[in-house]
């Protein structure tokens, strides 16, 4: 009988979202590499606890996987999980917009697949001391990379009221941003914020109780905004998606799962731009360099099935998009 006080194995703590669909979407890019006599290389740009990577390595015995994560704890756990495949993996402590640097350091010129599973991980939500969750009291941190950068406490204690309104409204899409920012500034004058519980209580005091019926937990949107600000998530994503596309070999694929509309808008824009002709309006012919570089593989976004959501409730808000490179990369 297992000891309830012992941490669960990584495989039990993390259920990969849309795992089978992700693997099936990446498979043709891997097969295209094989047909050219190349060793297939796939980047898991948001490695987390390694669930998607483990499944890829199990299915494709000749695959070389590059796993990237900014969270050192996640890298360590994934490293343990992927030990049986150590000779076919490179695990790198980096942010996923650093794909070009990672590939250069590894001597890799192009890859045949890139997977991105955005947002906060199960590990980060479950580890109380990380401060990502509003459901229990913890230090107000929210850094995905705990080795550097400002914390959520730094943001709420030092940002001006105007800046707090801006990020809570923009990143959290919170209609009560003004009320929340005003109360935060008033409360921190008496005592700086140190824990998530203190912040939750402050938000509860100004968000109408009825708002929770449609918007969920009153602190949900503010916590999202702070997490995005602390980790510069959307700025990173705006650089990361084009970098992933640029790294693709012919026939290679990028698969991205996003969890809120702000992320999905960025992914959609890059994919749509690459999937359209770049010929000037009214141009009489479409030259080769004007033809689309990408082919869209999903009609809009794909979502988890009811069965998958029942097994893994955190998958409920996942939205998947995928593209394939159909024209060679432009020369640098």
Curated annotation (Swiss-Prot):
E.C. numbers: 2.1.1.199
GO CC terms: cytoplasm
One of the GO biological process terms: rRNA base methylation
Annotated catalysed reactions: cytidine(1402) in 16S rRNA + S-adenosyl-L-methionine = N(4)-methylcytidine(1402) in 16S rRNA + S-adenosyl-L-homocysteine + H(+)
Localization in the cell: Cytoplasm
Coiled-coil stretches noted in the UniProt entry, renumbered to this chain: none
Any GO molecular function: rRNA (cytosine-N4-)-methyltransferase activity
Residues bound to S-adenosyl-L-methionine: 50-52, 69, 103, 117, 124
Class of the enzyme per the UniProt entry, highest EC level: transferase
Keywords carried by this UniProt record: Cytoplasm, Methyltransferase, rRNA processing, S-adenosyl-L-methionine, Transferase
Classification via Pfam families: Methyltransf_5
Role summary: Specifically methylates the N4 position of cytidine in position 1402 (C1402) of 16S rRNA.
PANTHER family to which the protein is assigned, alphabetical: 12S RRNA N4-METHYLCYTIDINE METHYLTRANSFERASE, S-ADENOSYL-METHYLTRANSFERASE MRAW
Similarity-based family: Belongs to the methyltransferase superfamily. RsmH family.
Protein name from the UniProt record: Ribosomal RNA small subunit methyltransferase H
Species for this entry: Arthrobacter sp. (strain FB24)
